[in-house]
């Protein structure tokens, strides 16, 4: 009886702890993501495997640097992965018949800048389902728009605006150079 | 310490100058002010990086500038603009859009136009698989001349019209071939799905079965009849259609024969399976044919500026005619 009790205790202890890995954004924000959730990101999964991270040394290792994602966006990606950590990871990008679940629709319904950052981050981190949901949401917004409406909605400059911005940038550069000469 | 103070002073002065110049410019042109602020943000970032003291101040300076551009809906933060998404991501977004919206996307900006101009990219492959019947995709000869997925998709939109056809004709499962059923004393026609009214367009038409006593290829308006009793050169029998009867090489329009075509003594007879290219030049109001890539001369001129559809009419039972749109023909 006592032997069985001793045998049961280690099993329970092993089941209890959840392994967390630390990841760091390009603006030094450190976030923790569970072992189960990290599977959703092919890039992070490969990093953990190739860099020698494991359940034993996860807490003592330095955070994994994510150079191309800022803290705010990385936090969103981690939140999404944690919410979907029980979901199977698709092997390829889903086809055009994707259905956008309610929770995910609310999740990706954010400001355009943040949404664009989230799209780029999920593309870089290869979170395939999140990228698909973002793309489907963006396509839903763009449906029925004229080119002018698309430019306004997605904050895309026209050629004329691009040229004006370039010209203005050059003038600013010249003004800065002139002031620098004056100061010297 | 003195040297450090000197270094910190210069960036501040530059930042001040940067801030002051937009105010002067904004007085001159209000339209440019949002872009000026955008540019000043970028310059502050560049100047703030070298100095350790400045980072604390630059975020505060950036905050006020970030509000007005959003309200004015002007372009801001080009580094995260939707126009600069990776190609893979753009293809993912575009695959959820119908064709009409893809056209709007092509006209939105250069990078989107570039993404959609790759005629064999994933988006066109996906739409091709979605729209074209399997019988057309698997036929190695049907669309062989069309070199890209986009062109094949376009041909599908111009193919024979399943709802604008004589009741004795039906379109085969490949979507590009019309089959005439064996019905006695009946002339049966079909029109393409889309008419044309501008530009130069070419249609490859192949008679896959026997001609019978009447086999006319040509153009028709929306109002031209597609069925009549008897064996009649229906296409070209009124002012709504123009036809070339391959059986006797006669051109017809408004019930009148315009002579043999090609205009030579004893023009060669059509061989079943030969490819006829019908070319309609809406800008100069002429139509003509090529046979196996050989120009045969102008067939019809002074065509009125109407929306014209490729059309054929047939009388032989179980004969078949295939039509594939190829876009603008290559001018020799």
UniProtKB/Swiss-Prot annotation, chain B:
Primary location: other
Keywords, alphabetical: Synapse, Ubl conjugation pathway
Where is the F-box domain positioned along the sequence?
Answer: 79-127
Q: Where does the B30.2/SPRY domain lie?
A: 138-330
* Location in the cell: Synapse
> Would you tell me the protein name for this molecule?
F-box/SPRY domain-containing protein 1
Which Gene Ontology terms of cellular component type are present?
A: neuromuscular junction; neuron projection; presynapse; SCF ubiquitin ligase complex; synapse
Protein purpose: Component of a SCF (SKP1-CUL1-F-box protein) E3 ubiquitin ligase complex which is required for the restriction and/or maturation of synapses in GABAergic neuromuscular junction (NMJ) presynaptic neurons. Promotes NRJ synapse development and synaptic transmission by negatively regulating the daf-2/InsR pathway in muscles. By targeting convertase egl-3 for degradation, negatively modulates insulin-like protein ins-4 and ins-6 processing. May stabilize synapse formation by promoting the down-regulation of scd-2. Regulates axon termination in PLM and ALM neurons.
User: Quaternary state and partners of this protein?
Assistant: Component of an SCF (SKP1-CUL1-F-box protein) E3 ubiquitin ligase complex composed of cul-1, fsn-1, rpm-1 and skr-1. Interacts (via SPRY domain) with scd-2 (via cytoplasmic domain). Interacts (via SPRY domain) with convertase egl-3 (via C-terminus).
Aminoacyl-tRNA synthetase among keywords: no
Organism the protein comes from: Caenorhabditis elegans
- Check the record and name the PROSITE patterns matching this protein: B302_SPRY (PS50188), FBOX (PS50181)
Look up the record and name the pathway of this protein: Protein modification; protein ubiquitination
What does the record note as the disruption phenotype of the gene behind this chain? Synaptic defects that include both overdevelopment and underdevelopment of presynaptic and postsynaptic termini. Abnormal morphology of cholinergic and GABAergic neuromuscular junctions (NMJs) characterized by uneven distribution of presynaptic markers snb-1 and unc-17 and post-synaptic markers GABA receptor unc-49 and AChR unc-38. Also, formation of abnormally large and small synapses. Frequency of spontaneous miniature synaptic release (mPSC) from cholinergic and GABAergic NMJs is reduced.
